[in-house]
Amino acid sequence: MTSFQEVPLQTSNFAHVIFQNVAKSYLPNAHLECHYTLTPYIHPHPKDWVGIFKVGWSTARDYYTFLWSPMPEHYVEGSAVNCELAFQGYYLPNDDGEFYQFCYVTHKGEIRGASTPFQFRAASPVEELLTMEDEGNSDMLVVTTKAGLLELKIEKTMKEKEELLKLIAVLEKETTQLREQVGRMERELNHEKERGDQLQAEQKALTKVSQSLKMENEEFKKRYNDVTSKALQLEEDIVSVTHKAIEKETELDSLKDKLKKAQCEREQLECQLKTEKDEKELYKVHLKNTEIENTKLVSEVQTLKNLDGNKENMITHFKEEISRLQFSLAEKENLQRTFLLTTSSKEDTFILKEQLRKAEEQIQATRQEAVFLAKELSDAVNVRDKTMADLHTAHLENEKVKKQLTDALAELKLSAVNKDQEKTDTLEHELRREVEDLKLRLQMAADHYKEKFKECQRLQKQINKLSDQSANSNSVFTKKIGSQQKVNDASINTDPAATASTVDVKPLPSTAETDFDNLTKGQVSEMTKEIADKTEKYNKCKQLLQDEKTKCNKYADELAKMELKWKEQVKIAENIKLELAEVVDNYKLQLAEKEKEISGLTSYWENLSREKEHKRSVENQAERKLEGQNSQSPHQISQCLKTSSEKSGHVPAVSNTQPVLQYGNPYATPETRDGADGAFYPDEIQRPPVRVPSWGLEDNVVCSQPARNLSRPDGLEDPEDSKEDEKVPTAPDPPSQHLRGHGTGFCFDPSFDVQKKCPLCELMFPPNYDQSKFEEHVESHWKVCPMCSEQFPPDYDQQVFERHVQTHFDQNVLNFD
């Protein structure tokens, strides 16, 4: 029991003194009474004091006013004492709106008690109002002032006072009557004295009563024996119950260990399930990303295939042109020889020089085209290298994500294990507390049983003493009765005076007998009460034992239910393990397939790079051949041209139109994109090569609009444009057609000498205005993304444009929707 008493001492020192009946507010300058109770945990001292502190105090010196606590009278250690103090009104604080509280401070300066907060407030008119129910049972509330209510109470008290005065008068009359009754009773007492003769009959009755008391004493002895036997049986039951409780505790400990193991396994399985679900989601995301990357790579491979095919076509076309030019050069040499033999006029030589110059320019243009093709091949190789680098970075990022996944899974497992440990610790603490509570109850029951056993022994001793006293009193009583009979026999032969004296002496033994009877009756009644109390306590102990047995049975049932639930959860966890193992195997198979696809793509990239290197070497050889052929003397070319012109009858006009490149000029400066999405701009696809400025044909551009991002998602070239490119003539055109088709790369006929006009703002520029500045002006009207440099038309929706820009800053990098 001492452990239960020490808990509040250690927990709170402010509860050692309890303040009673503390109101929420007091009047500022009115008399204030403070009632408090000293608990057994504090020892009062004459230097202890009670102070009024403002709420928020930090030390015992922050008091507003105080009074010395008086020492309680008749104080007994270990008992609670009620005390009272009275604070005078002029020492109290004014109505300042602050909260105060009473605090009990010891002579050592320790604060051992604090009251609830209160205020000092002057009475407001609203506070003077009170609500009370109507006395006429009309379910109405009547609002009155305190003064009116007090007046009503005073009137009632005055009426009660008058009634009490009337009652006093009546009671005085009754006292006179009672005095008369006392006199009458005294007379009756005298009459009762005359009834002394009846006492002898009562003595005979008392003898019978004493015999009955003996019988009752024997019955009490029997009851005592029964109680002792029951107490012994109870002790045996307590011993058996303690053994059973110990067995149950051992069973509880074993079941708790099983339960802890089951819970740990359950939590581990839950953590595994959660981690595997997370892995499943991550695998899904990874598969989605890999599929998107594969589609991108396939599209890029397709575009590169198309580029390679187009470049092969261009190479074959240029080879055919080279062979045709070689054949034409041979024919021209023959013609020149024949022409030199036939004609030698100055005009013909001038025409031949012009033709020779044009042929040289055409050869130079073909060289530039070959250089452009080489540059295109180098660009394709760079794109291939870039895609390979992107693949490598993707692999590295994949490995990094896998490492992060493993780290996150390890952290999740650690957190789950810590949570399980905390739960098991709390459960173990609660179970230990319950076991200690049961042990305390059993100890208390054993102590209670020992006390009862001691009380039974004490009662047995009292019964033995009473039996001895009753035997002695019976012997004395029989002796007195014998002496009384002798006196009665002697009084028969004496005078009436002697008989009167004997009559006076007879009541003495009757008073002793009545005292003895009263004592025996009182002792018997006390013993019966004690026996009844003992039986009640015995029944209570028995009930407690039954309650403990029922609790043990309940715990056993609960543990059985927990075992069943644990087995079910183990089965569910095993099934989940099997399902997760299947899912993991499927994902591993899918990952292996994806890795095979990636390895196949990488090998395909390597093959493409080898083929491109081979094509580059072939193109270099072709360029060398062209350079060797173009190094012939211009004299031979002029002769060839003369002979051909004489045979045909007219001067051949060299075609001024350049063959349109299908994949753009690599030396141009377009706004490049990333290239990872596989889309190219139209100006990268179809843009004519830079023409030689010495041809003498000026371009009067009226309107020019820069290329925009109008690429097709499924292919890199427009079928209509490709058809038009196929229709471009390679044969020499007449001079008129040459002059008209000279500016086909722009939107208007250059024969018109018109000013340049912006197609968006309709601003006019002079004909000799710089073309690059004009294009910069036109491009300034378009919206350009600051991240990917993608261009949008001026009338493009601003919200859609901002949403496009915000996608570059989206935190969810894996979101490709």
From Swiss-Prot:
Start-end of UBZ1-type zinc fingers: 755-781, 782-808
Binding residue positions for Zn(2+) 1: C758, C761, H777, H781
Residue positions, PTM Phosphoserine: S124, S138, S617, S633, S694
Coiled-coil boundaries: 144-628
KW Zinc-finger (keyword) present: yes
Keyword Plastid (UniProt): no
Entry protein name: Tax1-binding protein 1 homolog
